[in-house]
A protein has these predicted regions:
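Transmembrane-helix bundle segments that line or gate the permeation/cavity pathway
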Residues: 2-468, 502-534, 555-557, 567-574, ...
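Hydrophobic alpha-helical bundle architecture
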Residues: 36-39, 67-68, 282-284, 475-491, ...
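Membrane-embedded transmembrane-helix bundle of lipid-linked glycan/lipid transferases
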Residues: 320-323, 493-497
Length: 655
């Protein structure tokens, strides 16, 4: 699907400004306002909200002069740049990396003995503090002032941050480069051959669609859907200012009502009502919806049954799931990645022959020529492995960690967005958990565990904001807008670089200049994710630790077998209702948050399709897209109000 349309200078310049704005709003809303997390979803609310404002501004400018207006292609170029800016400035990179770099210096104490265990293995180019000079009783000032704020007119120590940020930025660019090349390879198979729907790309395309069928913004159902979350979050926001205004509760915790055995083993089971979540899930096939919520409920039933037999149920390290379920998921990921490879084999053979000179596939309209994509993927992958090795990781472990991350975890997460429309990319295991199935953690050695404590927190543990999905959705948007795919290469690269620079500057400035420093900002980046990697490896640093036991390999095999069965049934019988992707995602934070909106959407859509058919579904789509637009737009509105008025904002149902 080719096109001669490229990226205009006007769209590029506006995109730069919009990307910088998305960085600043995301960073302030998530870190300072705290209640509004608007950047870490795979379709960030800040992007949708700002895009609505951009559409209104473009319409107003067009009335003044046709030359001032923006074409759909230009609007979607700006949208794509904001998409990457929001991801990078949130959990996609910066909120995890920046606090991490001063965490060992600030949180080391005589009790945890991090200075003895970790500091000797930290390379000085990795961090802004001096690891050869641990100050346990009084942290080095670069870390102390970051977490407690600057007093007495001291300046921000920018010079201490520049070097480490450059090195970590290089690692991020290598990983992002591998994802870019992988997306270029996957696009034709997933879009043209398998015809995946890419639900997260549908809303922006619909918002700029020309006015046939009354147009998206002229459709009453669009605004009716918009009004539902707009009214709810207006009331909830006003309730924070004026308690007499009623508040509509969007969160119920089932575990609070399951107090008697064996139901008290159900674990953390919230019911969040996200209108945007219902809207996105409505776009999915009914069998996918059923699989997603069914397998999540099955995890809770497994815990209840295991509890009734007094089975030992340790938790998965630093994940909110039980170990026996986490390793089922791991087995599912490995089989699902193999299944995706299997169904892609004919296409991959064509790519290989094309790169060898046989010329079986025309890659002139792809993001990258196949030969460049394959070479780039190998170079970026090996470059990241060299970075890990330079930081102190054994080369074999670096290749293993990156291999599991890129070709299994990230691949399945990208598929969950492209096919399952999931708003979050979260899994239930890290690459190191695969190693732990075969050997205890302490056998890795202190140097390896030190590097893992950093890269787990920075890249491997929390995958929200995974840019691989941004590349794939961006290419789908380019196709929908008839934009030349290769023209989007500049859009992708520039947006990432702008986000890394603008976001890093602001997120270093903010804790130093805030009252109370990072300790008074959102706790997840400054007192949770940044610490968990070090606390996880701390027992193994102290001495030998036991392995994960029989549950890990046993339930890995169970998960692999179940997924193989589901994949075979789905491949062989089109009527089979259970999707292996639903099983692979069953224990993730994604489904913990969104299982209830998925259930609601399944009930609605199954009845719409049963009693109204495809025609009714098509007519109802604008209502559900309007709910997405309404919830996300209100998140941006309240973030801006909270920033301007220094006032509370309502919580939104995607923690």
């Amino acid at each position: 699907m080719g096109s001669d349309l490229g990226v205009s200078v006007k769209a590029f310049v506006i995109g730069l400004i919009a990307a910088a704005a998305a960085c600043l709003i995301t960073s302030y809303a998530e870190l300072a306002v705290k209640y509004i997390q608007i950047g870490f979803l795979q379709l960030p609310p800040v992007v949708v909200g700002l895009f609505v404002f951009l559409l209104l501004a473009a319409a107003w400018a067009r009335r003044l002069s046709a030359r001032l207006g923006l074409t759909p292609q230009e609007l979607l170029t700006v949208y794509t740049m904001m998409l990457f800016a929001a991801m990078i400035s949130s959990r996609g990179l910066l909120e995890k990396i920046i606090p991490l770099l001063v965490t060992p210096a600030y949180f080391a104490n005589q009790s945890n003995r991090w200075a003895d265990y970790y500091f000797p293995h930290i390379k000085d180019w990795m961090v802004p503090f001096d690891p050869s000079n641990p100050q346990v009783n009084s942290p080095q000032l670069v870390a102390k002032r970051f977490f407690e704020g600057i007093r007495g007119g001291y300046e921000i120590p920018w010079h201490q941050w520049i070097g480490p940020l450059v090195w970590w930025g290089l690692l991020a660019l290598l990983i992002f480069g591998a994802f870019l090349c992988l997306a270029s390879i996957l696009r034709r198979q997933w879009v043209d051959n398998e015809k995946l729907t890419f639900p997260l790309a549908q809303l922006p395309l619909e918002m700029v669609r020309d006015g046939r069928d009354a147009g998206f913004f002229r459709n009453r159902l669009t605004w009716l859907g918009f009004a539902v979350p707009a009214i709810v979050f207006t009331l909830n926001g006003l309730h924070g200012w004026f308690p007499s205004v009623p508040m509509l509760n969007l969160e119920v915790h089932l575990e609070q009502y399951a107090v008697n055995p064996p139901w008290n083993h159900i674990g953390y089971t919230p019911m969040f009502l996200s209108f945007a979540g219902v809207g996105f899930f409505f776009l999915l096939p009914v069998e996918m919806l059923f699989s997603l919520w069914f397998f999540f409920v099955l995890t809770r039933l497994q815990q209840v049954v295991a509890g009734s037999y007094n089975m030992d149920m340790p938790g998965m390290p630093i994940y909110p799931t039980k170990l026996f379920i986490g390793y089922q998921v791991m087995g599912a990921y490995f089989i699902l990645a193999g299944y995706l490879l299997y169904v892609s084999l004919p296409y991959l053979r064509h790519i290989w022959r094309t790169t060898a000179g046989a010329g079986e596939l025309d890659d002139s309209s792809e993001l990258l020529p196949y030969r460049t994509a394959l070479a780039g993927l190998a170079a970026c992958f090996l470059g990241a492995a060299v970075w890990f090795a330079a930081a102190g990781m054994s080369p074999w472990l670096a290749l293993f960690q990156l291999g599991v991350f890129v070709f299994i975890i990230a691949l399945v997460m990208a598929r969950s967005v492209a096919e399952g429309g999931l708003l979050m990319t979260e899994t239930s295991f890290r690459p190191v958990d695969v190693y732990r199935m075969f050997a205890p953690t302490h056998t890795l050695g202190a140097s390896n565990m030190t590097v893992l404590a950093f890269v787990d927190a920075g890249f491997f543990r929390d995958l929200r904001g995974l840019v691989l999905t941004g590349f794939l959705d961006g290419l789908k948007i380019a196709d929908g807008a008839q934009i030349r795919r290769r023209a989007f290469l500049l859009v992708f690269v520039t947006a990432i670089l702008v986000a890394m620079v603008v976001g890093a500057i602001f997120q270093i400035w903010l804790p130093y200049r805030s009252v109370g420093g990072g300790n008074n900002l959102y706790s997840y980046p400054y007192a949770s994710n940044n610490i968990w990697g070090f606390t996880d490896y701390e027992p193994a640093m102290r001495g030998p630790v036991p392995g994960v036991g029989w549950q890990a390999p046993t339930f890995f095999v169970v998960g692999a077998a179940v997924t193989a069965f589901l994949a075979y049934m789905r491949y062989a019988f089109h009527w089979w209702p259970l999707h292996p992707l639903g099983y692979a995602l069953c224990a993730s934070w994604t489904m913990i948050v969104f299982w209830f909106p998925c259930l609601v959407a399944w009930i609605i859509k199954s009845n719409v399709m049963r009693y109204g058919g495809m025609r009714t579904y098509v007519r109802a789509r604008p209502f559900f897209l309007g709910m997405i637009m309404g919830e996300f737009s209100m998140a941006v509105v309240w973030a801006l109000i909270a920033w301007a008025a220094k006032a509370p904002a309502p919580a939104f149902p995607w923690p």
